């Protein structure tokens, strides 16, 4: 492993870099006050609103290119509304994971309340429309403001539920506990917990944050309209998807002759009956509603993928709820892609991967080797009835943790402040070893780079396959002490086969990509890979270490730079271009979730290069770290 750079001086509670425009300090008569961290407020509504405000502000700062202020107050001009927002800065992050206090409007009354999340959403939406010179700025605000309100309200409900029972259930597994930990959601998304169309009672049952669970809703599908595929094997023999479904359904179903069981999310089962194509199949007797049956399944962090401890498979169900930027219904090309990747790995690529990173448990992909769906009598897919059968590789003792869940702030029994499991692990390791929190955190980060990030880079370099390895798609495997020892990737949507490697991949698996729509131009692959693995995953983790006051971000940026330098020095043919890109490019392309939301884009629809809005941000590996690998700036006192 590369050596760690020397730990810099302790960083202050507010580390605020310089702001280039409108950087005057707030006037003394209307200066915001930091006070207690809003996320720790005992009132869950206040804590949830504070989280919503911070998410919106982080998005705005990143997507509009605001730099750091001179002092501890960030000024955000709102020309469309004729005012200025004064934002107290709790912590300024080189990687963008800033912490803010409640903002005020300049020149407002002294006793005016702080600006809440819903008001802030309206102000920022109006400003974005004004800057883009759109004619009706209020038209853009309607949907976003409603979804921000919904997200904040649901977050408050989740917080209240979790604070009443903060401990992990004794009957659960480490994997499920992590999946249920994302109480605040994506820290750089304006509406991370919005779930339009889900009632409060349904939300309690169907949400991982409330530790919900439910039996699956089953339908019987006539074989004449069944579509399915399987590369699932047991004892060397392929198991058909129909038999897998029968096994998961158990003995409680009474199937009509000539039909196959297909599981649905209970919310989707109700919604699908209102669709003309599905309703026609029910009316004609090609589909039969069997109702809920079997044991309870638990939603994972994606909400639509469900897990049952001890079951051989997880199920990725279609769910027409709009969650973050998309309605979460499986697409047929994604189902085929999961099977295709499983076959590709079994063609010898998985063995090469394991040989490159020997030792248990190593790194692998959580496979999606089978699926079931419904075609209409005309042979066209009936949307909303597609289900992926995913391997469940995790036993009850496997500490397999979704990275986003590991970094997420959550209540702990007997503690007044929110804290992540990462902070808990680092503190426990520091106490056990007698080392500083910063030293332990830095070593933990280096181990993560070598056990999780390096294998992902290898797959891109060796095979030309880039993974959409953002924090929610990436699982880190921990040893009993809490150190990273391996990793897993999951998601049949998130594969990028480089167009330049088409011939090589065809040689590995003839016909690859023909029906899965997985080959992507290299320039698009480079941009997406840099964002998902580089910005979202690793820089996001560095931001969490810093904003949670575990390790100075600049020290981890320097360590990451040294790791990338080593990774960029391998053989040319099998070297991923990502390390050099991150080391040498002064700016990076970054997904803009606020702008994506404002433009009403669905990330699962349309060409991969236009599904989301991307903006350009400064590369902190250059702006905060010198080429020698040492921190480039001194923190402000």
Question: Where are the language model's segments positioned?
Answer:
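Nucleotide/phosphate-binding site architecture used for ATP/NTP-dependent chemistry
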Residues: 1-450, 479-637
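Catalytic-loop of the protein kinase fold
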Residues: 464-470
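Beta-strand segments within the central parallel beta-sheet cores of soluble alpha/beta enzyme folds
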Residues: 470-472, 488-489
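Hydrophobic residue at the +6 position relative to the catalytic HRD Asp in the kinase catalytic loop
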Residues: 474-476
């Amino acid at each position: 492993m590369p050596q760690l750079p020397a730990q810099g001086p302790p960083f202050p509670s507010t580390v605020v870099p310089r702001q280039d425009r409108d950087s005057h300090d707030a006037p003394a008569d209307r200066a915001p006050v930091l006070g207690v961290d809003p996320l720790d407020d005992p009132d869950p509504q206040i804590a949830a609103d504070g989280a919503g405000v911070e998410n919106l502000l982080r998005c705005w700062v990143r997507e509009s290119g605001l730099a750091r202020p001179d002092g501890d107050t960030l000024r955000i001009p709102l020309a469309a509304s004729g005012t200025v927002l004064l934002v107290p800065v709790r912590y300024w992050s080189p990687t963008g994971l800033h912490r803010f206090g409640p903002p005020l409007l300049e020149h407002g009354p002294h006793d005016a309340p702080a600006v809440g999340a819903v008001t802030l959403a309206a102000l920022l939406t109006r400003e974005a429309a004004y800057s883009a010179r759109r004619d009706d700025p209020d038209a853009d605000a309607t949907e976003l403001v409603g979804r921000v309100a919904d997200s904040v309200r649901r977050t408050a409900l989740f917080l209240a539920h979790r604070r009443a029972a903060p401990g992990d259930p004794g009957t659960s597994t480490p994997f499920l506990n992590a999946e249920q930990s994302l109480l605040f959601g994506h820290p750089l998304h304006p509406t991370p917990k919005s779930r339009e169309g889900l009632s409060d009672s349904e939300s309690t049952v169907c949400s991982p944050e409330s530790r919900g669970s439910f039996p699956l809703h089953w339908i019987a599908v006539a074989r004449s309209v069944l579509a399915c595929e399987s590369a699932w094997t047991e004892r060397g023999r392929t198991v058909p998807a129909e038999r897998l479904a029968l096994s998961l359904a158990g003995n409680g179903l009474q199937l009509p002759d000539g039909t196959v069981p297909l599981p649905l999310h209970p919310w989707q089962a109700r919604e699908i009956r209102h669709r003309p194509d599905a309703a026609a199949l029910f009316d004609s007797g090609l589909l039969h509603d069997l109702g809920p049956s079997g044991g309870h399944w638990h939603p994972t962090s994606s909400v639509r993928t469900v897990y049952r401890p001890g079951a051989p498979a997880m199920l990725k169900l279609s769910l027409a709820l709009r969650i973050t930027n998309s309605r979460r219904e499986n697409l047929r090309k994604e189902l085929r892609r999961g099977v295709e990747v499983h076959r590709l790995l079994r063609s010898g690529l998985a063995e090469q991967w394991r040989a490159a990173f020997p030792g248990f448990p190593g790194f692998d992909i959580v496979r999606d080797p089978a699926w079931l769906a419904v075609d209409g009598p005309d042979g066209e897919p009936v949307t909303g009835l597609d289900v992926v059968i995913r391997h469940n590789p995790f036993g009850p003792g496997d500490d397999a943790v979704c990275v986003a869940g590991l970094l997420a702030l959550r209540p702990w029994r007997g503690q007044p402040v929110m804290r992540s499991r990462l902070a808990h692990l680092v503190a426990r390791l520091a106490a056990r070893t007698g080392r500083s929190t910063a030293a332990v955190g830095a070593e933990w980060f280096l181990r993560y780079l070598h056990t999780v990030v390096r294998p992902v880079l290898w797959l891109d370099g060796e095979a030309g396959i880039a993974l959409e390895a953002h924090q929610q798609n990436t699982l880190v495997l921990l040893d009993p002490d809490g150190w990273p020892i391996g990793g897993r990737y999951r998601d049949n949507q998130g594969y990028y086969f480089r167009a330049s490697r088409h011939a090589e991949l065809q040689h590995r698996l003839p016909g690859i990509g023909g029906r899965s729509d997985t080959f992507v131009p290299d320039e698009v692959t480079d941009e997406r890979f840099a964002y998902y693995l580089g910005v979202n995953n690793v820089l996001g983790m560095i931001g969490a270490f810093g904003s949670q006051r575990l390790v100075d971000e600049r020290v981890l940026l320097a360590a990451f730079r040294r790791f990338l330098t080593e990774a960029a020095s391998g053989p040319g043919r099998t070297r991923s271009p990502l390390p050099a890109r991150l080391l040498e490019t002064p700016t990076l392309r970054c997904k803009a979730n606020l702008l994506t939301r404002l433009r009403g884009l669905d990330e699962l629809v349309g060409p991969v290069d236009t599904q989301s809005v991307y903006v350009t941000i400064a590369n902190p590996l250059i702006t905060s770290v010198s080429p020698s690998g040492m921190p480039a700036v001194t923190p402000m006192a």
